[in-house]
Amino acid sequence: MGTWCERCRRRDEQDYRNLDDCQKHFLLLMMGDFQHEIRGEQIVEQLTIPKEFVQRLKGDIPEEIQLETHNRNSYTVRVDKSQEKVIFAAGWAQFVKTFDLHMGDSMMFRFKGNSQFDVIIFDQVGREKVCSVAVDDYLDPNVQEGRTDATETLNSSRAHSQDDYLDPNVQEGRTNATETLNSSRAHSQPMPMQTPATETLNSSRAHSQDMPMQSPATETLNSSRAHPQPMPMQLPTETVNHFHAPHYPMQMPIENMALSRTQAMPTQMQSPPTYRWTQVQRDNLRYSLPSEDQGCRVGVIPDPIIGRRTKLNPVQEKVVNFKIQHIHSEIPIFVAVIKRSNVSGVLSTLSVAKRYVDEYLGGERFISLSRLGGKWGIRLLLVGVGVAQGW
């Protein structure tokens, strides 16, 4: 009976391996140091995939994969292979930060083909994380690019519709006015200094010429008459001192011409865009704002409290500082280094700093340790303030 069941299991295992990789799913639980690993004296942000997962795939995992969530956000992760291990290296830290992965969360992978994996992210109680499903237009560059293209297309269509409704004679008048303006800029000469009497005489003579010289205010007035406006336009009243005017060609200000065209367009009211933030952004904002209950400066994380006889090496200090940044605790954290005497022997105890117990635990002598949803009751002994019963 046992041999037959073993043969059936092997046959089922082989049949599963022969399936297309697109039909296979893998559930990975975030446990231990899923964010980083220690190599020598360096902390490497990476994740090691169990070899049992890799062995069930027919094909090899490429050196670079795409992790795509339900909201169509894709993240590139580099894959390192060493000693039959598959490791998510570069890009994995950004993925963890974006979706606020914590210990106890889980991820379901499904091979999609072309080096792509569909990823479903669950929290500690098995609910799908909202930040991996909801589409955030503010963070998605593709949506932003699509919005920009749509806005440009809409503005272009409105501009063409305005030109189509104009009278052909008015359009021809605009073209002629533009050509005349360009011609006057190309052949304009410096304006000589004239007295008021001479200027009046020359002004009367200028009206008999083919191309009259006009001031910016007069050109704006003629432009407004050639293009009917829906509202009256007030002409600027400027006093020009011809005796101190510099020698430069007469040119029509582009601002006046643009102003007259802008007034012909209807005023558009635009409401400010509504942005939706992910849980990661809301948490970062909440811990960066000042609080009345906080006794430290804004953005400063309290230093951990370490036992009197405990000394951390440089690697352990890096690990502790890295974990504290992701815990966001408002009170100091007690750090203990587990030794062999703490986990072996007839009576295994763990010493806790008396200063930490007096200041943050008060008169409590029963505490609760929790990890991955489980809780264990611990009793504190007054002698040496060591954790005894329940440890």
Curated annotation (Swiss-Prot):
Subcellular location: Nucleus
Portion annotated as DNA-binding: 32-125
TM helices/strands, residue ranges: none
Classification via SUPFAM superfamilies: DNA-binding pseudobarrel domain
GO molecular function: DNA binding
Region (Disordered): 143-232
InterPro entries recorded: B3_DNA-bd, DNA-bd_pseudobarrel_sf, REM16-like
A cellular-component GO term for this protein: nucleus
Record's keyword terms, sorted: DNA-binding, Nucleus, Transcription, Transcription regulation
Name assigned to this protein: Putative B3 domain-containing protein Os08g0325100
Protein source organism: Oryza sativa subsp. japonica
